[in-house]
C-alpha cells in the first residue's frame, strides 16, 4: 500500500525524517483547496507495502462509496456494485477532485446512479461557485433554502465529460403538490454546455425532453427530441405542469427558483391559501398572485467507473511523492472591505455613461491613482475630503494619500505611470493647480504638483472638437497619447507636430516622435503596442487611417500606412449601415473601446456586447463572446495570463457567440458576468471561478480595471454596491479585490508508521500555518482528509 500525495507544483520539498522498518517514507507539500473557501492541504506520503490481499487494486467492487478510502467514481458505479443499495450519502472521487467527498446518490429512480448537484425551493443562484454548504445536500436533501455544488465540483464529477454529452441530460425532480407527496421528473439535455454552468435563466437550446409523473398526473407525460431555445422549456399555449422555468421573483425579494407554467393548477378551488404556508413545497407569499416557486432537486448521471478513471489517467506518484501545486492567480470573488469611496454625484454635474465616477486607474510611487468624474472622496468613518477628479491611495493600506492634492477643473479619462516616476494624466480639463494644461499634464505622485521637467502640450485646431485625452500607454521607450486632438509639442521643440488623435512621446527626452505621426479621422479610445513597438493596435470611433479604410480598429506597422488589413466582424450591423463604403461611413456603429496586446494574440472590446481574441500571426478571430442582458465591453487589462474584460453588463456571457440577439445559436456555453470577468489570454475562455457581484446606479458599468503591485484588482466605474465577505458594501466609484491565496503550505515532517493490529498507524509533525488539513494518499489517489496529525488505515 503506497501513501503518496497527488501531483502539485510549487515550493521545494524535503524528505520525512523517519520511517517504520522496511518502509520508505517521504513527506510532500500538497495544494490549497479549490473553491471559495481557501482551506490548505499538506500531503503525507509513505510507502508501506501491500496490506491484506490488495483487493482495492484488483477488484473494482472494492470502491463502493462506503468510506473515503473506498470512494467510487460515480453514483452509477455504486449502483452497479450494489444494485440493492438505497439512496443516501456516498463517497465519490475522480482525479479532478482534490480528495473524496460525500454526495447524495439517488439509487432508486429510473435505474439509479444519479448524483444530486443542487436542491431547494428559493434563493437559488446563477453564480458558478454555487451556494451554501455543500454538505447540506447529502445531510438534508429536502431543505428549502437552496444549496448548490460549485461548478468546479460538478465538472469534476463528470470526469471530463461535457454536460451536453451526458446521455441522460439534467434531471429536475419537482414537487407537484404543497405536501410533497407527488413528484415530477423532468429530464432534458442542455445542448451548448461544454462545462457546467448555473445560468439556467439564460436562453439556450434544450432537447430530448422527457417528463414523467405519478399515475394521477400521467396525462401530463411528455417526450420530444426536438431542440428548443428558451428559459429551459415552455409547453406551448398550455404552459402548465409540463413547463419548467427558472425565474427571478421580484415579489419575493428577487429570489431565484423554479416554477411550473402559469396555467398549472396546483391547488383546488379556494385552496390557494395552502401556497402561502412556509412549510409548503410549492410556495408564494400571501397577497402574491404570481406563479409560485417549486421545491426542486437537480441530478446528473455521469456513468464513470474505475476503468474510466484508469483510462484517463490517475495520479502517477513516485515513491518520493509529488511536487507541490498552486492554484491559478486570481482575485477573491468578494470585494475587500472598503476604506474610501467617491461621491455619488459627478464633479462636472453631468450625467451619462461618459461621466462615470472612475474611468482611469494606475499605480506609481507607492500609490494607486483613480481618475474620473467625482466631486469628493469619503472614508468609511464618514470623513469627507473635497478632492475632485483624481485621488491617490497608498498601495499597502488603501488609505488616502493626503499629500496628493492636485486641483483639476475637469474629468480625468486616463492615467499612466511613467518610468521616471511621474504620473501622466489625460482627460477633459484645461486648468491644473491654476495653470493652463489642456487635456494632458504630468504630476508629481507625492504632492500632486505639476512636474515641469517636460513641457508637453496638446491642442485641437478644429474649433468644434475640444481636446480630450482618452488613453495613455507606455511601451518600450514611448508614451502613446490617444483621444481627440490635432497637434502636440514635446520638450525639445516649441513647434507643434500634426499627429491627429494619436501620437507618441520619446521617454528618453520628452520629444514628439516626428517620424511616427498617424492621422485618424475619429477619436481614439484605446491603444496598445506590442513588444518593441513593431505593432501598435488602436481602437476607436474612426473609419480612416492616413486616408485609407480602417473601420474602428487598426494595426499600425508603418505610421504612413494607408488603412490596414485588420478587420472586425461586428456583432450587429444596422440595416442603414453603409457597408459598401465603410471608409466614409457616417453612422455610429461597430465602434471599439479598448484593445490589448497579449503576446501571441490581440484582444478587442467594444460595442454591441462583444469581446474577442485575434491570433497575431493571421489577425484572424479565434474567440468571441457576447453578453446579455448586457452592454459594450469598455476596458481590457492584462495581468499575467489573465485578461480582465469590463462592460456594462449584468447577466450572462455567451462564449463562442458571434451575433447579438441570437447569442445562443453559436454559443458553447453561458456563464454569469457582473460588470467584469476574467478570461484566459491564450484560450479565450472565461475563468468562471472568479465571480464578483457588483452593480451600479445607472447601468453604465465598469470603465477601468487594474492590478496593482500587491496583486489586488481595482475596478472603477458606475459602481454603487459590491458583495464582500461580510455582505453588501457601498463601494461607490471603485472596488478592490485582493488576490486569493495560491501558495502551497509548508511541508509536514517526521512521518512515522507503526502497526496496530491489522491497521497501520500514521503520525507526523504538523506545520504552523492555521486551518491546515492533511490528505492521506494511497497508491494513485487520496483516501482521507484530516485536521490532526495522525491517521489509521
Over which residues does each language-model region extend?
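Secretory targeting and sorting signals
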Residues: 2-57
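Secreted/extracellular small peptides and ectodomain modules produced from precursors
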Residues: 6-9, 73, 103, 647-648
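Short small/polar-residue motifs
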Residues: 31, 72-77, 99-103, 746-752, ...
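Short glycine/proline-enriched turn or capping motifs at secondary-structure junctions
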Residues: 43, 292, 727-730
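Mature extracellular or lumenal effector domains of secreted proteins
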Residues: 56-322
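Extracytoplasmic surface signature
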Residues: 304-792
Amino acid at each position: 500500500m503506497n501513501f503518496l500525495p497527488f501531483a502539485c507544483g510549487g515550493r521545494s520539498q524535503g524528505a520525512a525524517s523517519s520511517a517504520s522498518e522496511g518502509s520508505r517514507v517521504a513527506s510532500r507539500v500538497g495544494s490549497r483547496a479549490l473553491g471559495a473557501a481557501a482551506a490548505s492541504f499538506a500531503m503525507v506520503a509513505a510507502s508501506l507495502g501491500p496490506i491484506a490481499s490488495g483487493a482495492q487494486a484488483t477488484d473494482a467492487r472494492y470502491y463502493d462509496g462506503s468510506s473515503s478510502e473506498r470512494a467510487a467514481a460515480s453514483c452509477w458505479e455504486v449502483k452497479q456494485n450494489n444494485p440493492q443499495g438505497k439512496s443516501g450519502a456516498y463517497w465519490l472521487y475522480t482525479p479532478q477532485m482534490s480528495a473524496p467527498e460525500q454526495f447524495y446518490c439517488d439509487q432508486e429512480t429510473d435505474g439509479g446512479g444519479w448524483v444530486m448537484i443542487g436542491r431547494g425551493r428559493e434563493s437559488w443562484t446563477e453564480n458558478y461557485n454555487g451556494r451554501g454548504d455543500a454538505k447540506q445536500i447529502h445531510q438534508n436533501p429536502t431543505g428549502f433554502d437552496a444549496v448548490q455544488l460549485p461548478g468546479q465540483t460538478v465538472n469534476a464529477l463528470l470526469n471530463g465529460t461535457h454536460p451536453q454529452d451526458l446521455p441522460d441530460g439534467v434531471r429536475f425532480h419537482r414537487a407537484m403538490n404543497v405536501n410533497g407527496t407527488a413528484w415530477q421528473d423532468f429530464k432534458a439535455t442542455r445542448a451548448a454546455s461544454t462545462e457546467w454552468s448555473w445560468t439556467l435563466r439564460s436562453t439556450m437550446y434544450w432537447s430530448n425532453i422527457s417528463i414523467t409523473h405519478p399515475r394521477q398526473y400521467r396525462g401530463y407525460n411528455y417526450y420530444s427530441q426536438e431542440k428548443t431555445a428558451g428559459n429551459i422549456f415552455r409547453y406551448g399555449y398550455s404552459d402548465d405542469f409540463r413547463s419548467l422555468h427558472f425565474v427571478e421573483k421580484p415579489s419575493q425579494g428577487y429570489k431565484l427558483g423554479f416554477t411550473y407554467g402559469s396555467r398549472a393548477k396546483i391547488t383546488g378551488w379556494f385552496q390557494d391559501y395552502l401556497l402561502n404556508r412556509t412549510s409548503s413545497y410549492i410556495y408564494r407569499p400571501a397577497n402574491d398572485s404570481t406563479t409560485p416557486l417549486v421545491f426542486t432537486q437537480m441530478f446528473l448521471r455521469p456513468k464513470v467507473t474505475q476503468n474510466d478513471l484508469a483510462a484517463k489517467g490517475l495520479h502517477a506518484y513516485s515513491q518520493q511523492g509529488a511536487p507541490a501545486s498552486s492554484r491559478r492567480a486570481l482575485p477573491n470573488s468578494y470585494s475587500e472591505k472598503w476604506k474610501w469611496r467617491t461621491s455619488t454625484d459627478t464633479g462636472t454635474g453631468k450625467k451619462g455613461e461618459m461621466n462615470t465616477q472612475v474611468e482611469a486607474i494606475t499605480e506609481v510611487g507607492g500609490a494607486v491613482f483613480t481618475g474620473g468624474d467625482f466631486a469628493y472622496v469619503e472614508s468609511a468613518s464618514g470623513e469627507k475630503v473635497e478632492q475632485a477628479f483624481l485621488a491617490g491611495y497608498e498601495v499597502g493600506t488603501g488609505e488616502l494619500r493626503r499629500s496628493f492634492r492636485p486641483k483639476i477643473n475637469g474629468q480625468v479619462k486616463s492615467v499612466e505611470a511613467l518610468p521616471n516616476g511621474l504620473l501622466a494624466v489625460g482627460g477633459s480639463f484645461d486648468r491644473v493647480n491654476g495653470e493652463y494644461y489642456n487635456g494632458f499634464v504630468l504630476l508629481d505622485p507625492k504632492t500632486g504638483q505639476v512636474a515641469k521637467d517636460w513641457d508637453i502640450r496638446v491642442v485641437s485646431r478644429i474649433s468644434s472638437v475640444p481636446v480630450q485625452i482618452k488613453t495613455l500607454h507606455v511601451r518600450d521607450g514611448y508614451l502613446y497619447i490617444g483621444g481627440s486632438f490635432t497637434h502636440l509639442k514635446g520638450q525639445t521643440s516649441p513647434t507643434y507636430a500634426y499627429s491627429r488623435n494619436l501620437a507618441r512621446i520619446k521617454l528618453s527626452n520628452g520629444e514628439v516622435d516626428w517620424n511616427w505621426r498617424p492621422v485618424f479621422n475619429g477619436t481614439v479610445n484605446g491603444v496598445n503596442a506590442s513588444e518593441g513597438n513593431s505593432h501598435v493596435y488602436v481602437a476607436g470611433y474612426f473609419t480612416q487611417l492616413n486616408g485609407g479604410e480602417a473601420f474602428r480598429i487598426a494595426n499600425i506597422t508603418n505610421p504612413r500606412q494607408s488603412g490596414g488589413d485588420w478587420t472586425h466582424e461586428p456583432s450587429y450591423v444596422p440595416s442603414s449601415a453603409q457597408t459598401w463604403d465603410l471608409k466614409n461611413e457616417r453612422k455610429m456603429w461597430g465602434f471599439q473601446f479598448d484593445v490589448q496586446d497579449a503576446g501571441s494574440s490581440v484582444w478587442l472590446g467594444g460595442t454591441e456586447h462583444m469581446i474577442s481574441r485575434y491570433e497575431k500571426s493571421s489577425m484572424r478571430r479565434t474567440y468571441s463572446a457576447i453578453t446579455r442582458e448586457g452592454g459594450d465591453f469598455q476596458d481590457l487589462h492584462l495581468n499575467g495570463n489573465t485578461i480582465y474584460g469590463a462592460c456594462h453588463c449584468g447577466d450572462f456571457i455567451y462564449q463562442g457567440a458571434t451575433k447579438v440577439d441570437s447569442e445562443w445559436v453559436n454559443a458553447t456555453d453561458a456563464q454569469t458576468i457582473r460588470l467584469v470577468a476574467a478570461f484566459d489570454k491564450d484560450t479565450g475562455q472565461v475563468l468562471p471561478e472568479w465571480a464578483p457581484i457588483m452593480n451600479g446606479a445607472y447601468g453604465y458599468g465598469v470603465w477601468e480595471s487594474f492590478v496593482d503591485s500587491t496583486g489586488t484588482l481595482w475596478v472603477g466605474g458606475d459602481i454603487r454596491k459590491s458583495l464582500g465577505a461580510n455582505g453588501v458594501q457601498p463601494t461607490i466609484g471603485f472596488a478592490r479585490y485582493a488576490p486569493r491565496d495560491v501558495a502551497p503550505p509548508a511541508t509536514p515532517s517526521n512521518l512515522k508508521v507503526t502497526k496496530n493490529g491489522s491497521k497501520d498507524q500514521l503520525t507526523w509533525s504538523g506545520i504552523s500555518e492555521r486551518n491546515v488539513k492533511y490528505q492521506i494518499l494511497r497508491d494513485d489517489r487520496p483516501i482521507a482528509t484530516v485536521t490532526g496529525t495522525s491517521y489509521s488505515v
